[in-house]
Design a protein with these regions (language model features):
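Short hydrophobic beta-strand that contains or immediately precedes a catalytic carboxylate
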Residues: 460-461
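Formylglycine-dependent sulfatase
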Residues: 2-13, 20-447, 453-456, 467-487, ...
């Protein structure tokens, strides 16, 4: 019998595992793994949340989007309602995803660009791909990476950056920084969705002039079919697919497919921005049609990969994940991410594994650093989880809902900003602007002054009774709640050796367990 494993998490991503033939000697077969993670895909932007069997388990209205493939996928899967992106920003989340470490240890505390040498994925730690490679896997990466400090290493223009923008954001990742990926079709970050580019394994640039998720899905299908003998068919494979949309821009048909836009183009904005905390009068509101069109396009691209897996008999295990959400006119902010609001932090996570994982909903508050060890655990590689990993392996809970596993009490929130600059204007440190904690009931975020390190702003929401986070509660009137959240936050900050713990920031509020 085939065993299929599929996981969908935040922003949106796909991780797939499938079984291989058992080697001689009767040893357990190694599963194939595919992990797809679209950028800036929020948990609320999935149609099935409004359908029977799902809507009863969440206290929010889903966005009015069309995601038919994800709808079907979710009904065969374990779906998390409360997966969290702890530092809801592209590079920091990806650093945590790859290393299983929080941003202060992964090497990626800030979004990567050429002005931030302080932010680049560490070369001296084993990433999830290093572990899979060491276990005998062929490893392939497709699409957006955005974890490297850009340097002037353009393969086609030696001594120059791969883009002329200042600071440079896009980056070429040389072979020695690919962490076990032996097949490469990737770029750093570039936001022209119908004019993407990629560097292949040998550093050759490709400019396909095609909407990037559909192009990447096609390349994944080609890899699955082993066109050109790009992988060893006797080996299991680990694939990561970093789709950029529905990440901004979302302003015109240059950013999405017209057939998807047509589903939304005639809808009044107040019928699209239906969350009570959304403001359809904001200038950004027109973006909703294009954002939702990109969501539908990503769903279609995901479907192409699923169809190929089924066609080839490789649909046995699959997981889906993302990096952060999108506020989209909620909370009266133009910033789509990097905030403790549920639209930004709460991401999709879905797992399908017939015969192994029971289709169900679960409120496990999975954090970004937990993904790497959990994926390794699901692939039977728990014994190979690196000692550097700070996240927790929750694979036993996926495989058995009654497993004796200590669940997290909540998820840490992290916001870092640029710190000190050197004489050349390069960022040499980062400012830990905010830390917070989200439990099943409340969200707390504390913001400090850059110089004094004193509290300057707080957010406290009763998420159970105020799911759209419209009523910021005063700290002094909710002391018992704040004390409890700060106690939980202090434990995690100490455990991960966060700058707030090292500097004892707000120690009058946060007990660090001295």
């Amino acid at each position: 019998m085939k065993n299929r494993l599929n996981i969908l998490l935040g922003g949106l991503g796909l991780f797939a595992l499938q079984g291989c033939k058992a080697p001689q000697g009767g040893q357990a077969r190694q599963p194939n793994v595919i992990y797809v993670f679209p950028d800036q895909y929020r948990n609320q932007a999935m149609e099935f949340w409004g359908q029977e069997g799902f809507r009863e388990r969440v206290n929010f209205r889903n966005d009015p989007v069309h995601t038919p493939r994800l709808n079907d996928f979710a009904r065969e899967s374990m779906v998390l309602t409360s997966a969290m992106s702890n530092c809801p920003l592209s590079s920091p989340h990806r650093g945590s995803l790859l290393t299983g470490m929080y941003p202060n240890k992964s090497g990626v505390p800030l979004n990567c660009n050429s002005n931030r040498p302080i932010s680049s994925l560490r070369a001296d730690v084993d990433c999830v791909s290093d572990v899979f490679s060491g276990a005998g896997y062929d490893c392939a990466y497709f699409g957006k990476l955005h974890t490297d400090f850009p340097t002037p290493n353009d393969p086609q223009r030696p001594g120059k950056y791969v883009e002329d923008r200042i600071p440079a954001w896009d980056a070429y990742t040389p072979k020695e920084r690919r962490h076990g990926f032996n097949y490469w079709y990737s770029y750093g970050t570039f936001d022209e969705h119908k004019n993407p580019h990629y560097w292949d394994t040998d550093g050759k640039r490709h400019d396909p002039h095609e909407w990037s998720p559909l192009h990447e899905a096609g390349k994944v299908v080609s890899y699955l079919r082993n066109e050109g003998n790009v992988r060893d068919p006797k080996k299991p494979f680990f694939i990561m697919v970093g789709m950029n949309p529905p990440h901004s821009p979302y302003r015109s048909l240059d950013d999405c497919m017209e057939q998807d836009f047509n589903l939304y183009k005639d809808r009044p904005l107040d019928s699209l921005l239906i969350r009570p905390n959304a403001d359809p009068e904001m200038a950004k509101a027109e973006s909703a049609r294009y954002y939702f069109a990109s969501v539908t396009g990503v769903d279609r691209a995901f479907g192409q990969i699923l169809d190929a897996l089924e066609e080839l008999g490789l649909d046995e295990n699959t997981i889906i994940v993302s990096d952060h959400g999108e506020t989209m006119c909620s909370q009266h902010t133009d910033d789509p991410k990097n905030s403790p609001f549920s639209e930004s932090m709460n991401v999709p996570f879905i797992v399908r594994f017939p015969g192994k994982i029971k289709p169900r909903l679960d409120d496990l508050m999975l954090s970004s650093p937990d993904i790497m060890p959990t994926l390794l655990g699901l692939a039977g590689l728990s014994g190979s989880i690196p000692a550097t990993v700070q996240g927790h392996n929750y694979a036993p809970l996926f495989l058995d809902e009654k497993a004796d596993v200590v669940r997290p009490t909540g998820a840490l929130y992290i916001q870092n900003l640029d710190g000190e600059k050197d004489a050349d204007g390069k960022i040499r440190s980062y400012f830990p602007a905010s830390r917070g904690f989200k439990s099943a009931h409340y969200t707390l975020a504390l913001y400090i002054d850059r110089d004094s390190r004193k509290l300057v702003k707080s957010l406290l929401f009763d998420d159970r009774n105020d799911p759209y986070q419209m009523n910021n509660l005063p700290l002094e009137e909710n002391k018992d709640v704040v004390d409890g959240l700060c106690a939980e936050m202090g434990k995690v900050l100490k455990e991960i050796d966060d700058p707030w713990y090292r500097e004892r920031i707000l120690s009058d509020m946060i007990p660090y367990g001295e």
